[in-house]
Every structure is written in structure tokens, then in C-alpha cells.
Amino acid sequence: MDSSTWSPATTATTEPLKPHERIRNAADISVIVIYFVVVMAVGLWAMCSTNRGTVGGFFLAGRSMVWWPVGASLFASNIGSGHFVGLAGTGAAAGIATGGFEWNALIWVVVLGWLFVPIYIKAGVVTMPEYLRKRFGGKRIQVYLSILSLMLYIFTKISADIFSGAIFITLALGLDLYLAIFLLLAITGLYTITGGLAAVIYTDTLQTAIMLVGSFILTGFAFHEVGGYDAFMEKYMNAIPTVISDGNITIKKECYTPRADSFHIFRDPLKGDLPWPGLTFGLSILALWYWCTDQVIVQRCLSAKNMSHVKAGCVMCGYFKLLPMFVIVMPGMISRVLYTEKIACTVPSECEKYCGTKVGCSNIAYPTLVVELMPNGLRGLMLSVMLASLMSSLTSIFNSASTLFTMDVYTKIRKRASEKELMIAGRLFILVLIGISIAWVPIVQSAQSGQLFDYIQSVTSYLGPPIAAVFLLAIFCKRVNEEGAFWGLVIGCMIGLARMITEFAYGTGSCVEPSNCPTIICGVHYLYFAIILFVISIIIVLVVSLFTKPIPDVHLYRLCWSLRNSKEERIDLDAEEEDIQEAPEETIEIEVPEEKKGCFRRTYDLFCGLDQQKGPKMTKEEEAAMKLKMTDTSEKPLWRTVVNINGIILLTVAVFCHAYFA
């Protein structure tokens, strides 16, 4: 069967929003409704059965989570709808190399669980900027990093997820774009606001199962349709569109033919679209930032009940990260084989006809596969998968962003805020994030360029390396001080912003219409730029630190690797300020009799976790015991051995996969 003339693709691509492409049958609608009912039921169960009335309960799930929901939540938080659209789209356009982004994580989840999380737990922190404040003292690094992280969440993570989710919804349902996005964000925000981190982790666990089952089913259908793996490799290399000219314009051959190295991860260091030194070292820097210092990821690990559960969750996530190559990237490539004219289009007028944008339609590879290939019922399941990935990713971002705002920004504005006030502030900030997200949709929509995955990774390459450098040195080099860390962050981010603003001002371009950005600025691949920026940031941090006063060890016990097992009492650099903040205004709340609350008010308080049923006030000994539990990193010898062996196996699997597909 000639892939380029396959009849369903031909009939379906002329009008993406025809009724026969939309989900209008009872089977699909029933599956979607059942999915939403189950997700809301799980969220409500978590709301009723977990402690959400304290900052520790809402933001860290009371440090009570076991390993398997932690691992599932790590995976679901990472795999958003941007992966289904971006990974599959880049796979359709350029082959399997983009799967290397997923496999690189196998190494860094081990680094996270074994090296970074023990320090964070011993430090007794809730957020990553809070760790830097304890490590270096002062407020400017904490506030600077919090605001930078919130900007990154809004303009990369949230915008990318909403954009990619919108592509799928528009293609499959034909609903009004803004109505669909508003409903998704409303439901997402609802169980994030009401349930806290426990609800997020439990719903993530459910949605991980949905994603994996649905993705495996679609992968089976796709490989069956294409004729197996060997036929897939052969047909992909011949998946060339027939329309390659428009009037006097003839597209260059390299713009529409599959790459000769499509089935290799490691590519030419100078001419490759993902050069192997960049994929090996540059990507590792981005992974260090994302997996070891990003609030969304680390917060899941901090919620685990002990270190063995942290490590087991990281290993579980690592094994899950093996799958996207086979259930997202390769199905995206198969979509190019089955619907070549649509997915591999290069002539601007043809692309605009198929997907509404002139630069290419690779982003719709996975959604097209779902709409065209899946039977009734299963198509609804796959829509649920996309909704699950979108919502789980957004809930993770909303919860972690509200944590950052509440603990690192709001407490600087309201130093004596009560526990209840902090809880309300965190929930209201989620509403603000939802509002900004909806307002950002038209900008993302107008910037549709077919370069979604590259856009996300390039922005990360420009802003992430200085943060990665500061955290790495903060933990493994105790000589680094506040001045070095601050100026390393500021100068590094200024360099990254200069490159980013220049590149986006000129436009990233495409194969058909290359960018006019000067080679000296934009000619360096973004993964190579990440390496350069990381090295510059490290040099600045070290040089400034060596020429300024060091931090005494008494302030660093259990905050850096060399002093991680110290038993001495640590004097925090901002201890006096913390003493002031630890005096919440609780006396006002005690004066309000519980009986005077009406039925509506009691229901509202229960719904939002603001009931705060007060038990007896904790004694000094009980507070010390609670603090000891929250900062305990001890492990039982048997389980420590089990997770260590699994960590070694995971690293071995990572090396094998890279070598096999090199």
C-alpha cells in the first residue's frame, strides 16, 4: 500500500473539522464522561481523606506518600500533552533522536533520588528557593529565583501544554477553542485548589495508568497498520510528499525527505539537527536543572514518607521514561508514513490547508493518528489520555507554582501571616495563574510555528543553565557564598536572555524560509549554547566567591554534601527573621466560636481544606519529634540495598538503550 496515497488521509485532510472527524458517537462520549467522573471521584476522595489544613499537608502531602504514587506522579508531571504533540511531531519530522531527551532522564532521576533529595530533606525545605535562602542567606536569591521560576512556568510549561492540548481538541472535537480550554482549566484548577498535593499525586497515578494503557493500544494499532517494525523503517524513509512545488517555488530536497540518520540518536556534531555532544552534555545540563532543581519534580520526592520510597519512586519514573520512544516518538513517525501528504507537507499553501499554519503540520501527527486510526470507544479513550496528560501536567504546575508564591513571595509581603491566610493565598494564586493562562492562549495560538518542542528546549537552554550551575555548586562546593551565587545567576540569565530575545526577534525560521539572525549569535546550536552558558555561570560563581568572604561551617551543617551527616546544631543565616515569622496570629481565630458557622460556611471550609480542626497545642518535645520526622533520611538496610540495586540496573539499561540506537 502506497503510504502517500492512502485514502483515509486524503479524504480526511481537506477539512480538519468535518463532523466525521469529530467525536460524536455514544461510545466515545461515554468513555470521556466516565473518565471525568472517575478523576473527580479520586480527587474528592483525596480531598476527604488527607490532611490539607496545613502548609505541609497541602504542599507536601504531609510526607506520607509511598513510592508508587510518587513515581507515577513524577512521570505524569513530566509527560504532558506537549510530549504527545511535540515529541511525536519532531519524531515525524526528524526521526528517533528526540527520544534521547527522554532516555537522558534515566540517569538524572537516579542523581535526583540519591544525591539531591537527601540534602533537600535534611535542610527541611518546602521549595527550592527556600533551600538557596538557607544555604546562602539573604532574600534576593530566593525572591529572584521564585519570580524567574514562575515566569518559566507561565510562558513555557503552561503555554506549551495549553497550545498542544488545543491542537488536539480543535482537531478531534471541533469545539470552540476557548470554551474547551476554559472547561479544562476550570476542572484542573478545581481539584488542585480543593485537594492539595495529595489529590494531585493520586490523580496523577490514575492518569499515568490511563496514558500508558491508551498509548500502548494506539502503538499496537499503528504498527499493525504499517506492517511491523521492519516495514515501518523502510516506509518511513520513503514517506515523501508528492506536492513539493507551488508556482515558481520549488522546495529544497532536504526539506521534505526524511533524514539519512533518522534511526540514529547520535548525530553529526556539526551538521546534525541534534549533535551528539549537545545531546550528551548540553542536554544533561538541562536535565540537571529540570529533574534535580525544578519545584514541580522535587516537590513530589519531598512528599515521600522516607528515603527508600523517594529512591523507589525515582527508579519507577526512570523505567516509565523508557516508554515514550516507543509509544510517542515512533507512532509519530508512523503517522508520517500513513498520512504523508498532511504530516510531511512543506509547501506553505498545502500546510495551511491541512493544519492552518504555513511552516509545517508535524505537530498534528499524534492527534491525526488517534482521530483516523482508532475505532469508536478507543478514540474516546485516547482523547482521555490527551486530556489526562494535559490536566496532570497543569495540576502539577499550578500546585508547585502556588507553593513558590506562597512560601517565597507572599511570606515576604505578609511576614506574620497565619496558616489559614497562607492556605487561602496559595489557592487564590492558582486562580490568578488560570486567568493568565487563558489570556496567554491567543499569543500562543498566533505564534504557532511547528517548532513547539524546539521552542521549549531552546528557552530552557537560555534560562536553565545558570540555575543548574548555582544548585550544583551550592550542594557540592561549600566555599560558594551568596555573592557568587547571586551574580552567577544574574549575569548568566542576562547572557541567556540576550540570545533568546535576539533569536525570537529575528524569528527561528524554517527549512523553507531560514532565519536572518546573525550567525555569530544564532549559529551556535542551543544545546551547545547551554554548555557554554553553564561553564560561564560556574566560573562567575567560583571567582566571585573566592574573592569574597566564605560562609562559616556552623551555617552549612546538612546543607551541602561534605557536611550532610553532621550532628551539630545548625544556625540558619536568617534565624532571627525566621523567629519573627514563626509567630502566627492564632489568637484571633480561637475567639470565633465553631457553633456560629452556618451550614454553607462549614461546607465551604471543608471543601477548601480551611476547617483546620485544632487538636491540643504541640509541646516543644512533640515539635522536635515532628521536625525530626520531616528531616529524617534514614533507611532500613534491606530496602536500601533493594533500591540501590534497582538504581544500578536502571543506569545499565540507560547505557544499553543509548548504545543500541546510537
From Swiss-Prot:
Asked whether the keyword DNA damage is assigned, the reply is no
Q: How does it sit in the membrane?
A: Multi-pass membrane protein
Recorded family membership: Belongs to the sodium:solute symporter (SSF) (TC 2.A.21) family.
Q: How is its activity regulated?
A: Enhanced by the interaction with PDZK1IP1/MAP17; but unlike SLC5A2/SGLT2, PDZK1IP1 is not essential for SLC5A1 transporter activity. Possibly modulated by cholesterol binding.
Q: Name one GO cellular component term.
A: apical plasma membrane
- What would be the name of the gene that encodes this protein? SLC5A1
**At which residues is glycosylation annotated?**
248
**PANTHER family, per the entry:** SODIUM_GLUCOSE COTRANSPORTER 1 (PTHR11819:SF151), SOLUTE CARRIER FAMILY 5 (PTHR11819)
- Subcellular location as annotated: Apical cell membrane
Q: Could you state a single Gene Ontology molecular function term?
A: water transmembrane transporter activity
> Which positions does the record annotate as the modified residue Phosphothreonine?
587
Its BP terms in the Gene Ontology are: intestinal D-glucose absorption; renal D-glucose absorption; sodium ion transport
Q: Keywords in UniProt for this one?
A: Cell membrane, Disulfide bond, Glycoprotein, Ion transport, Membrane, Phosphoprotein, Sodium, Sodium transport, Sugar transport, Symport, Transmembrane, Transmembrane helix, Transport
Which reaction(s) are listed as its catalytic activity?
Answer: D-glucose(out) + 2 Na(+)(out) = D-glucose(in) + 2 Na(+)(in); D-galactose(out) + 2 Na(+)(out) = D-galactose(in) + 2 Na(+)(in)
User: Where are the membrane-spanning stretches?
Assistant: 25-47, 67-90, 96-117, 140-169, 177-193, 203-221, 276-295, 310-331, 376-406, 423-444, 452-477, 482-504, 526-547, 643-660
Q: What is this protein called?
A: Sodium/glucose cotransporter 1
The record lists the organism as Sus scrofa (Pig)
Which segments does the topology annotation call Cytoplasmic? 48-66, 118-139, 194-202, 296-309, 407-422, 478-481, 548-642
